[in-house]
């Protein structure tokens, strides 16, 4: 909103988060589905746009599976408490559900965010699978750990950002894999 964008639709299934969205964005459609049950076509319909029209699809799947403060791989392949009223199976796989939805939406740009721990140790395999997953659906993607304080926020918080650009858009604007990282992630 501060950058001048419009939020066309939201997917959230935790009641307290839905209530917050409704308070902050009363005119934005909210799809209260588990992302495993959501399709990109559901999202497009709620946003009242066609496949390929969306400029930016933004998603931040839960990060507890990759947080260095959590159980990490000891908690993988298990059902976890996600909120006071929700449990989720294999929370570490939700980024791939986001990619599945993104395949149907075909936004020009996709942004995903998670904890820096997704780049460390055995979680690095997930990082690589996410980058490759975007490639499998027609995007060139890069992921990088950034410190929020370097970009003007009042907190020193390390987060991993994935940016994926649809291949035809990259061609149209003259971005290629060799210069993509420096264009997307300029030095602060």
Residue positions per predicted region:
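Flexible loop residues that form catalytic
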Residues: 13-15, 62, 115
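Hydrophobic alpha-helix-in-membranes signature
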Residues: 28, 60-61, 106
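Class I S-adenosyl-L-methionine
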Residues: 41-54, 64-188
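Redox-cofactor binding/interface segments in oxidoreductases and associated redox assembly factors
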Residues: 33, 58-59, 112
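SAM cofactor-binding core of SAM-dependent methyltransferases
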Residues: 1-37
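Compositionally biased, intrinsically disordered/low-complexity regions enriched for serine, proline
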Residues: 23, 58-59, 183-185
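Residue-level recognition of the N-termini of beta-strands and the immediately preceding loop/turn
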Residues: 8, 54-56
């Amino acid at each position: 909103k501060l950058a001048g964008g419009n939020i066309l639709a939201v997917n959230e299934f935790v009641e307290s988060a839905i209530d917050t969205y409704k308070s902050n964005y009363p005119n934005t459609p909210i799809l209260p589905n588990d992302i495993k049950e959501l399709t990109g076509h559901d999202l497009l319909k709620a946003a009242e746009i066609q496949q390929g029209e969306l400029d930016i699809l933004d998603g931040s799947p839960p990060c507890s599976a990759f947080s260095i403060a959590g159980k990490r791989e000891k908690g993988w392949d298990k059902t976890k408490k996600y909120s006071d009223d929700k449990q989720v199976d294999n929370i570490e796989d939700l980024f791939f559900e986001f990619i599945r939805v993104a395949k149907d939406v075909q936004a020009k740009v996709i942004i995903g965010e998670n904890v820096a721990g997704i780049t460390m140790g055995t979680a690095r395999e997930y990082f690589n699978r996410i980058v490759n997953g975007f490639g499998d659906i027609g995007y060139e993607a890069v992921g990088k750990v950034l410190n929020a304080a370097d970009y003007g926020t009042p907190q020193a918080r390390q987060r991993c950002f994935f940016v994926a650009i649809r291949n035809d858009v990259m061609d149209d604007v003259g971005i290629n894999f060799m210069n993509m990282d420096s264009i997307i992630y300029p030095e602060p």
